[in-house]
Protein backbone atom coordinates (compact mmCIF):
# COMPACT_ATOMS: atom_id res chain seq x y z
CA UNK A 1 0.00 0.00 0.00
CA UNK A 2 1.48 3.38 -0.90
CA UNK A 3 1.94 5.87 2.00
CA UNK A 4 -0.96 8.17 1.06
CA UNK A 5 -3.43 5.29 0.69
CA UNK A 6 -2.19 3.77 3.94
CA UNK A 7 -2.59 7.12 5.72
CA UNK A 8 -6.14 7.51 4.42
CA UNK A 9 -7.00 3.93 5.39
CA UNK A 10 -5.63 4.42 8.91
CA UNK A 11 -7.54 7.67 9.37
CA UNK A 12 -10.78 6.04 8.23
CA UNK A 13 -10.24 2.95 10.36
CA UNK A 14 -9.32 4.75 13.58
CA UNK A 15 -11.97 7.44 13.16
CA UNK A 16 -14.64 4.79 12.73
CA UNK A 17 -13.46 2.96 15.85
CA UNK A 18 -13.07 6.15 17.89
CA UNK A 19 -16.33 7.82 16.95
CA UNK A 20 -18.45 4.68 17.08
CA UNK A 21 -17.24 4.09 20.63
CA UNK A 22 -17.61 7.73 21.57
CA UNK A 23 -21.12 7.95 20.25
CA UNK A 24 -22.38 4.45 21.09
CA UNK A 25 -20.17 3.48 24.04
CA UNK A 26 -20.91 4.40 27.62
CA UNK A 27 -20.16 8.05 28.13
CA UNK A 28 -20.36 10.21 31.20
CA UNK A 29 -21.45 13.82 30.97
CA UNK A 30 -18.79 15.92 32.71
CA UNK A 31 -20.78 19.11 32.32
CA UNK A 32 -22.65 21.45 30.01
CA UNK A 33 -21.39 24.95 29.31
CA UNK A 34 -23.87 26.98 27.25
CA UNK A 35 -23.68 25.50 23.71
CA UNK A 36 -20.98 22.90 24.54
CA UNK A 37 -21.12 19.56 26.37
CA UNK A 38 -18.13 17.75 27.87
CA UNK A 39 -17.97 13.94 28.09
CA UNK A 40 -15.62 11.18 29.28
CA UNK A 41 -15.48 7.56 28.15
CA UNK A 42 -13.13 4.57 28.18
CA UNK A 43 -11.67 3.59 24.82
CA UNK A 44 -9.43 0.50 24.81
CA UNK A 45 -8.73 1.00 28.54
CA UNK A 46 -7.69 4.61 27.90
CA UNK A 47 -9.78 7.46 29.23
CA UNK A 48 -10.91 9.73 26.43
CA UNK A 49 -12.70 13.04 26.91
CA UNK A 50 -14.33 15.26 24.34
CA UNK A 51 -16.41 18.36 24.01
CA UNK A 52 -19.00 18.71 21.32
CA UNK A 53 -21.54 21.14 19.96
CA UNK A 54 -24.30 21.19 17.35
CA UNK A 55 -24.82 24.02 14.85
CA UNK A 56 -27.03 26.94 15.79
CA UNK A 57 -27.67 27.59 12.09
CA UNK A 58 -27.41 25.50 8.92
CA UNK A 59 -27.78 26.66 5.33
CA UNK A 60 -27.34 25.24 1.86
CA UNK A 61 -29.13 22.96 -0.54
CA UNK A 62 -29.73 19.55 1.05
CA UNK A 63 -32.54 17.24 2.07
CA UNK A 64 -32.84 17.39 5.87
CA UNK A 65 -34.21 13.82 5.95
CA UNK A 66 -31.03 12.52 4.28
CA UNK A 67 -28.57 14.38 6.46
CA UNK A 68 -27.20 13.03 9.71
CA UNK A 69 -26.50 15.23 12.72
CA UNK A 70 -23.47 17.50 12.37
CA UNK A 71 -21.08 18.03 15.30
CA UNK A 72 -17.77 19.68 16.13
CA UNK A 73 -15.48 17.79 18.52
CA UNK A 74 -12.34 18.57 20.49
CA UNK A 75 -10.86 15.37 21.96
CA UNK A 76 -8.29 14.59 24.66
CA UNK A 77 -6.87 11.14 25.37
CA UNK A 78 -5.38 10.64 28.83
CA UNK A 79 -1.65 10.14 28.34
CA UNK A 80 -2.04 10.80 24.60
CA UNK A 81 -3.07 13.56 22.25
CA UNK A 82 -4.83 16.68 23.49
CA UNK A 83 -7.08 19.15 21.72
CA UNK A 84 -7.61 17.16 18.52
CA UNK A 85 -10.20 19.06 16.48
CA UNK A 86 -12.60 17.20 14.21
CA UNK A 87 -16.00 17.58 12.63
CA UNK A 88 -18.75 15.18 11.68
CA UNK A 89 -20.76 16.76 8.88
CA UNK A 90 -23.76 14.46 8.61
CA UNK A 91 -23.09 14.08 4.86
CA UNK A 92 -20.17 12.82 2.79
CA UNK A 93 -17.82 15.48 1.53
CA UNK A 94 -17.01 15.74 -2.15
CA UNK A 95 -13.56 14.33 -2.87
CA UNK A 96 -10.72 16.78 -3.45
CA UNK A 97 -12.73 19.71 -2.08
CA UNK A 98 -11.46 21.55 0.97
CA UNK A 99 -13.51 21.91 4.12
CA UNK A 100 -13.19 25.42 5.56
CA UNK A 101 -13.00 25.97 9.32
CA UNK A 102 -13.70 29.67 9.91
CA UNK A 103 -13.54 31.33 13.34
CA UNK A 104 -14.63 34.96 13.09
CA UNK A 105 -13.06 35.30 9.62
CA UNK A 106 -9.84 33.35 10.34
CA UNK A 107 -10.01 30.48 7.85
CA UNK A 108 -8.18 27.15 7.91
CA UNK A 109 -8.53 24.16 5.58
CA UNK A 110 -9.43 20.77 7.01
CA UNK A 111 -8.71 17.35 5.55
CA UNK A 112 -11.99 15.56 4.68
CA UNK A 113 -12.57 11.79 4.69
CA UNK A 114 -16.14 10.65 4.01
CA UNK A 115 -18.35 12.61 6.47
CA UNK A 116 -15.52 13.70 8.81
CA UNK A 117 -12.74 16.27 8.66
CA UNK A 118 -9.57 16.98 10.65
CA UNK A 119 -6.69 19.38 10.59
CA UNK A 120 -3.43 18.09 9.15
CA UNK A 121 -1.37 18.42 12.35
CA UNK A 122 -1.44 18.94 16.09
CA UNK A 123 0.14 22.37 15.49
CA UNK A 124 -2.91 23.39 13.46
CA UNK A 125 -5.19 21.90 16.15
CA UNK A 126 -3.53 24.17 18.73
CA UNK A 127 -4.14 27.19 16.47
CA UNK A 128 -7.79 26.19 15.95
CA UNK A 129 -8.40 25.74 19.69
CA UNK A 130 -6.77 29.12 20.46
CA UNK A 131 -8.99 30.75 17.83
CA UNK A 132 -12.08 29.04 19.27
CA UNK A 133 -11.21 30.21 22.80
CA UNK A 134 -11.11 33.82 21.61
CA UNK A 135 -13.89 33.63 19.02
CA UNK A 136 -17.62 34.11 18.98
CA UNK A 137 -18.70 31.91 16.06
CA UNK A 138 -17.32 28.97 14.13
CA UNK A 139 -18.46 28.34 10.58
CA UNK A 140 -17.82 25.07 8.75
CA UNK A 141 -18.14 25.26 4.97
CA UNK A 142 -18.16 22.01 3.04
CA UNK A 143 -19.25 20.64 -0.30
CA UNK A 144 -21.41 17.52 -0.37
CA UNK A 145 -20.85 14.63 -2.79
CA UNK A 146 -23.50 16.01 -5.20
CA UNK A 147 -21.67 19.36 -5.18
CA UNK A 148 -23.88 21.40 -2.87
CA UNK A 149 -22.23 23.98 -0.59
CA UNK A 150 -23.37 23.49 3.01
CA UNK A 151 -22.65 25.93 5.82
CA UNK A 152 -22.96 25.10 9.53
CA UNK A 153 -22.55 27.85 12.12
CA UNK A 154 -21.67 27.06 15.74
CA UNK A 155 -21.70 29.30 18.80
CA UNK A 156 -18.44 29.31 20.74
CA UNK A 157 -20.25 30.42 23.89
CA UNK A 158 -19.17 28.05 26.66
CA UNK A 159 -16.30 26.56 24.63
CA UNK A 160 -13.48 27.59 26.98
CA UNK A 161 -15.25 26.37 30.13
CA UNK A 162 -16.15 23.05 28.50
CA UNK A 163 -12.55 22.64 27.33
CA UNK A 164 -11.34 23.16 30.91
CA UNK A 165 -13.56 20.26 32.01
CA UNK A 166 -11.88 17.79 29.66
CA UNK A 167 -8.43 19.24 30.34
CA UNK A 168 -8.98 18.58 34.04
CA UNK A 169 -10.31 15.07 33.48
CA UNK A 170 -8.17 13.85 30.55
CA UNK A 171 -4.83 15.65 30.22
Kindly give the residue locations of the regions a language model identified:
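Bacterial N-terminal signal peptides that target proteins for export
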Residues: 1-11
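Hydrophobic alpha-helical segments
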Residues: 12-13, 159
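Conserved nucleotide-sugar donor-binding subdomain of glycosyltransferases
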Residues: 17
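A generic "folded-domain core" signal
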Residues: 24-171
Amino acid sequence: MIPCQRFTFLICFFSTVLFSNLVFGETKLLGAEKKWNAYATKLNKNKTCFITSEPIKTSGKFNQKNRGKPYVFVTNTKGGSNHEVSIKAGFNFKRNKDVIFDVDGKKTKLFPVDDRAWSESSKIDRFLVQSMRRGKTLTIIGTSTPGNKIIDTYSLSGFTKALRLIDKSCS
